From Swiss-Prot:
This is Forkhead box protein unc-130. It comes from the Eukaryota. Disulfide bonds: none annotated. GO terms for cellular component: nucleus. It comes from Caenorhabditis elegans. Keywords: DNA-binding, Nucleus, Transcription, Transcription regulation. One of its GO terms (molecular function) is DNA-binding transcription factor activity, RNA polymerase II-specific. The keyword Transcription regulation applies.
Length: 333
């Protein structure tokens, strides 16, 4: 049996197996790396399509809720909207209420401005050529009892003149002021059997001829209370002379005769004060207000009070005087 060297060598040499190929592992790694890239590339159109579908569905649901009057529960970002809508509704209602209040205030201002402008707007009737004093006197003289209240005077003027009817009540305060400031009008109190609101007003008996021959267009003279009323008051005064007489005031006739000495109940408060009555002399027509001011200015001041320093000096000097007098008494003894 023949053996060749090649067969012997081949039998003695170990058979070498080829190393395992790593290509499948590399392909697996490539697939692992490439799969997310392919997924992300494919997921982008899918996500955009899903977002579009979500927007379309949200828009349709929102339109349906608006048509049905319901409010959406979520916003575009998925945030609940119901509370925000409630807050917006409350703020809108508060704004509406404030606007309503502002409208009401505007209406009130308009009404007050209309009332205030009623006295300034032009009237279709001409203004009567009478003063307020003439109107008041006219109404009082045309009344049966010759006395009227403020409301009755205004009622007479309104019924008599259309001009004042349109301007009422803008001129009512003028009537009130003329009644209280003019001496020709006298206030008459209501009797016990005549209850009601407000006093009566009448003309002073001395000013009935204030207007010429019953014409109220012009007053003949301006009525003013005379100062003779003061002399009449003094003539009926219980005391023979008033407590204070101003300088320039004449003696009443009753002071010309001598008066009896009035007994005093106690010592005078200021015995050093000697009454120094100046020479009295006169204006005939003197106003009552001026008279009162003159009487107040002529009150004689009292003696000035002694200061504390003088009191101290007098008190300190008194013991010295007593001591000196005691010494002189001893020496004389």
């Amino acid at each position: 049996m023949l053996f060749s060297m090649e067969s012997i060598l081949s039998s003695t040499k170990p058979k070498l197996e080829p190393p395992p190929k790593l290509e499948p592992e590399v392909t697996i790694n490539e697939q692992v790396v490439d799969l997310p890239r392919s997924n992300t590339r494919l997921s982008e159109p899918s996500t955009s399509a899903s977002v579009l579908e979500h927007d379309l569905k949200f828009g349709e649901s929102r339109k349906r809720s608006r048509s049905l009057g319901d409010e959406p529960t979520e916003d575009e970002d998925g945030v609940p909207v119901r509370k925000a809508n409630k807050r917006n509704h409350s703020t809108s209602s508060a704004a509406d209420s404030s606007s309503d209040d502002a409208k009401d205030d505007d209406d009130d201002d308009d009404s007050t401005s209309r009332k205030s402008m009623s006295g300034h707007r032009k009237s279709s009737h001409a203004k009567p050529p009478y003063s307020y004093i003439a109107l008041i006197a006219m109404s009082i003289l045309n009344s049966p009892e010759k006395k009227l209240t403020l409301s009755e005077i205004c009622e007479f003027i309104i019924n008599k003149f259309e001009y004042y009817k349109e301007k009422f009540p803008a001129w009512q305060n003028s009537i009130r002021h003329n009644l209280s400031l003019n001496d020709c009008f006298v206030k008459v109190a209501r009797g016990p059997g005549n209850p009601g609101k407000g006093n009566y007003w009448a003309l002073d008996p001395n000013c009935e001829d204030m207007f010429d021959n019953g014409s109220f267009l012009r007053r003949r003279k301006r009525y003013k209370k005379n100062s003779d009323t003061y002399h009449e008051m003094m003539s009926h005064h219980p005391m023979p002379f008033p407590p204070f007489l101003p300088q320039g005031m004449p003696f009443p006739p009753r002071m010309m005769h001598p008066m009896a000495n009035i007994p005093m109940l106690g010592h005078p408060m200021n015995p050093r004060a000697v009454p120094n009555m100046p020479a009295f002399f006169i204006p005939q027509n003197i106003d009552s207000q001026k008279l009162l001011s003159m009487m107040a200015s002529r009150i004689m001041p009292m003696d000035a009070p002694v200061s504390s320093g003088q009191k101290r000096t007098s008190s300190s000097s008194s013991p010295n005087e007593n001591g000196s007098s005691a010494v002189s008494d001893k020496l004389s003894a």
